[in-house]
């Protein structure tokens, strides 16, 4: 069976963010995590290596995942309905996921976000090109969506997580020599929410 077009945008790459995860462990005593849209599962593996009970959900059934975490990953396509994930966790992590799922399927994945006390997500702004980007939106839009599902946006925690983020790398423009962060999704568009 071939992979549906709307899945697999991760290209077998996990965008790790040890800085943000360490901050959540240190400041909020996070002991468990769910990564929604985990791709190959790198953040699940990183969290597990730090002693967290870690899980992931991703729709791509073609990815070869590390044997150490494969039993912690649920293969699920949110276009088919809610997942069967049934645990409560301290942190729900979701990087480069929201913009890939049609708005009409929000109820399906928000049930899993509601399993966390804290949420860290990234979003793609309006007009951001990418594989199956079908719900690129503003920060305000996502704050309203999470509020509707029982979360409060935490501006202070968002600032701290963006500062703590180690995702991405510094690159230089070949023409101007100007340095910039590349693939720094959390620094640019990370948002933090607390369950009410």
Label each PLM-derived region with a short phrase.
Residues 100-101:
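A short His-aromatic
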